[in-house]
């Protein structure tokens, strides 16, 4: 009887097509082959389609994310303090304003060290990089400058394409496929500054478990994975939000509605953006202590998650209150201006 080598492209593809999860060794081999440009485009298309059909496991994600993170441009002088990232997988199609970007600056204004890892638009009309660039933040800056900003100001922004040069060769094929792939899930997991805590939004409820398992596998101290009411990849004001809380290697599930935290329940329509100009105006207004109440409340809800994962607050209710108080001031906008000016020099 012939025993097939389990670490070959055909065997790996057959395993995926049979809806079997890959071993860690297979996952590592596949990701390293992508990074070394050893997979033909037609094979890559087949693998990405097979993952999409099977559904990805948390162990597959963590194995591949570790390889991808190690291949990123990682500075030698990483900060000694713990960092938090705030991001979502995208794909909700809701076209909300840039909630997680606002959350990053409000959280930093409240003392949390934020390493925001982001890109241009994935599913919405405007990505975090798009809106920040439109407000004057330089994107293509040296890794040293990015880290220096974090140490000086307590917040920085990492423009994903600048930090993951090994993925450039895959970009045209991913775009030509026209569907979301495993790389859309890996992106939020591979912050090169290696935060120890994270708030991560998913657009589909069936991603809650694999993404939380992946974060655990990558050694995070604390994390929140959230699927928002109405299908948002953020905590929403529209109703019951589904959560996975990771704390000390234990993952627990919870459902929290805005009313549980004294917030208004309102449809996601109230959170919609409308292109780059409008989204930029909304974000600037909020950070400047202005903006409408519903926008402030959804920022406060998601900021409370950041305050919890960072250990700044023990409960979400107190985190919401602190965030709302901050949103009545211009502290967050002043911090944005400091970061913008620092990165521009």
From Swiss-Prot:
Binding site for Mg(2+) 2: 233-234
Gene name, Swiss-Prot/TrEMBL: trpD
UniProt organism field: Prochlorococcus marinus (strain NATL2A)
Metabolic or biological pathway: Amino-acid biosynthesis; L-tryptophan biosynthesis; L-tryptophan from chorismate: step 2/5
Designated name of the protein: Anthranilate phosphoribosyltransferase
Chain sites annotated for binding 5-phospho-alpha-D-ribose 1-diphosphate: 88, 91-92, 96, 98-101, 116-124, 128
Keywords assigned by UniProt, alphabetized: Amino-acid biosynthesis, Aromatic amino acid biosynthesis, Glycosyltransferase, Magnesium, Metal-binding, Transferase, Tryptophan biosynthesis
Residues where Mg(2+) 1 binds: 100, 234
Classification via Pfam families: Glycos_trans_3N, Glycos_transf_3
Lineage of origin: Bacteria, Bacillati, Cyanobacteriota, Cyanophyceae, Synechococcales
